[in-house]
Structure formats: structure tokens, C-alpha cells
């Protein structure tokens, strides 16, 4: 097996300025440390070698320094399953230039098992990758860059699915209709159209949905909540995209034009429906009799 390239600490680190670090409370600092530890643990479990050169560079520049509690494993066997089961990982502590000469200590750090409540959004997160995304979303940082297009990415592990955008790779294929997707989440959601599964049910009326976002949107019909209001006429909407679509009626703007007939539409749904007429495509099939239709409204 060929050896994997050496990865520096900079490849997995998320840098914060001194001002940003000062604004984070104790729980978020501890959370940041735990998330960084698990990111490094993932890389080590895959057989990557972690270089400590970045730590020395940070010390020379007087920036925030992260100190290691024990040596990184250099010849780790890439047994991902057993490595991810380890409860004790590398421990790292934030120190400054002032106390950098103090002796390094060893401390065990446990993988997060309890949900963390995000102070900015109020949502509970259990998995560290979710927590990482939550922190980066609020901070606005995108520390990883795509080599193909230069696009900045928030997650260390997002370059792989992002790369599939360039290669048009669709590795997840439905075994019922052979439709393919770039990630397993979209495939699972698609399979619900075959099985009829609707796991998200409204506790008020019992109506069920395939996606959690659809359930939340439906629940607003019970509460009467319409948070998106048009500043020109005062009309309010449940969803933001409905407001944007409505605003185009004031402008008289038609952004979607058919290249075959020249017909223009103010809404993407109307444009897609017109396009299907030209192609003859019938993507909406009945699960009971197999008859297919061009429009979902005809299927219903």
C-alpha cells in the first residue's frame, strides 16, 4: 500500500484572530479544541502523517499556539473502524508566547457524547462534524480551498463531494430506476418516492412529509406565521422564496427565457414546465400503475 502524503497542522486547523478568540466563551473554546482533535483523529485513522511544523511557525509569529499533549502516531495502520472507536485522543491546549516555554503536559480528551447547544442558533448538535459546520457558519470562515476552481469551503471533508461537481461524478445510484446522485443523502431522499415513506409527521394534523424542512414549512400554516413581508404592498409569506417570486411581479421581471420558443417566465417552475413540453420528458410516475406525467400536478 502506498504511503499517504504528510499533512501539516495547518491543513486541519481553523484559525481565529485574537479578537475573535476573545469573543468566544469557555464552552465554545473547549468545543473548538474537541472538534479539532476529532478532525486530526480522522486523518490519523486514514493513515496520514501529521507534521508539527505549523506549531513552530505560530510560535515565531506570536500568534495563537496549540500545544500537543502527546506525540502524533507516525505509522498508523489505516484501520478506520478501530481507530474511530478510541475514546482517548491527542490533547491540545491554547497557550501564548508568554508561557510557551512551560513543560508540555499530557491530558486525555474524550470524544463528545452529549449534545452541544449552539448559542447563536439555539439548535442541538451531537456529531462533531455538525458542530464544526455550525461554528464555521456563524464565524463566516471558509479555511479550505478547492484546487480546481479556488472556491473556499468550510469543511475539511467537503472537498471530496465538491470535487465531484467538477468531474460530474455521481457515485450513488438508485437500484430501482438507475437515477444517480452525488451524495447518499439525496439518494435516500429520492428512494422515498419509490417506497412512499414519509418519516416527518405533523403532530397537529397528522400530515406526513419526506423532508424535515417541508414539515417545518407546513407547521407555519397552523400557527399563521408569515415572517417574510413585501415592503411594497405589505403582503406576507411563509417562505422567503415565495416573497422573492412575489417581488418580481412588482418589477415585471421575467428572468427565465426558453431558448427554443423564446417564451419568458418570471418563475423557474413555469420555465421548467415549458421545457418538459419541448423534451417530452415525463419524470412523474405513478407507483401503482406506472403511468408517467410531465407535471407533478397531473400525477396528483
UniProtKB/Swiss-Prot annotation:
Q: From the UniProt record, list the coiled-coil ranges.
A: none
Family annotation (InterPro entries): KRAB, KRAB_dom_sf, Znf_C2H2_sf, Znf_C2H2_type
Query: What range(s) does the KRAB domain occupy?
Result: 7-78
Instruction: Zinc fingers (C2H2-type): give the ranges.
Output: 172-194, 200-222, 228-250
| GO molecular function list | DNA-binding transcription factor activity, RNA polymerase II-specific; RNA polymerase II transcription regulatory region sequence-specific DNA binding; zinc ion binding
Report the locations given in the UniProt record. Answer: Nucleus
Please indicate which superkingdom the organism of origin belongs to.
Eukaryota
Tell me, which GO biological process terms does this entry list?
Answer: regulation of transcription by RNA polymerase II
Family label:
Belongs to the krueppel C2H2-type zinc-finger protein family.
Functional description taken from the UniProt entry: May be involved in transcriptional regulation.
Write the protein's name. Answer: Zinc finger protein 705A
Amino acid at each position: 500500500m502506498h504511503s499517504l502524503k504528510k499533512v501539516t497542522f495547518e491543513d486541519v486547523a481553523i484559525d481565529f484572530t485574537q479578537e475573535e478568540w476573545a469573543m468566544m466563551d469557555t464552552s465554545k473554546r473547549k468545543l473548538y479544541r474537541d472538534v479539532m482533535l476529532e478532525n486530526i483523529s480522522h486523518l490519523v485513522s486514514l493513515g496520514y502523517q501529521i507534521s508539527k511544523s505549523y506549531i513552530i511557525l505560530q510560535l515565531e509569529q506570536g500568534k495563537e499556539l496549540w500545544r500537543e499533549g502527546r506525540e502524533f502516531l507516525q505509522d498508523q495502520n489505516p484501520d478506520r473502524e478501530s481507530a474511530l472507536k478510541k475514546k482517548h485522543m491527542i490533547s491540545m491546549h491554547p497557550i501564548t508566547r508568554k508561557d510557551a516555554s512551560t513543560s508540555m503536559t499530557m491530558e486525555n480528551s474524550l470524544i463528545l457524547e452529549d449534545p452541544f447547544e449552539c448559542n447563536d442558533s439555539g439548535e442541538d448538535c451531537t456529531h462533531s462534524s455538525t458542530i464544526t459546520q455550525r461554528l464555521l457558519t456563524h464565524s463566516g470562515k471558509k479555511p479550505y480551498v478547492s484546487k480546481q476552481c479556488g472556491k473556499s469551503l468550510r469543511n475539511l471533508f467537503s472537498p471530496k463531494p465538491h470535487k465531484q461537481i467538477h468531474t460530474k461524478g455521481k457515485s450513488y445510484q438508485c437500484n430501482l430506476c438507475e437515477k444517480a446522485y452525488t451524495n447518499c443523502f439525496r439518494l435516500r431522499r429520492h428512494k422515498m418516492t419509490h417506497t412512499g415513506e414519509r418519516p416527518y409527521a405533523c403532530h397537529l394534523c397528522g400530515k406526513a412529509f419526506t423532508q424535515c424542512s417541508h414539515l417545518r414549512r407546513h407547521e407555519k400554516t397552523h400557527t399563521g406565521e408569515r415572517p417574510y413581508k413585501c415592503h411594497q404592498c405589505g403582503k406576507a409569506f411563509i417562505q422567503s422564496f415565495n416573497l422573492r417570486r412575489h417581488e418580481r411581479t412588482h418589477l415585471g421581471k421575467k428572468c427565465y427565457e426558453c431558448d427554443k420558443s423564446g417564451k419568458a417566465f418570471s418563475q423557474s417552475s413555469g420555465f421548467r414546465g415549458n421545457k418538459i413540453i419541448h423534451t417530452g420528458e415525463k419524470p412523474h410516475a405513478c407507483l401503482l400503475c406506472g403511468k408517467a406525467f410531465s407535471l407533478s400536478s397531473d400525477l396528483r
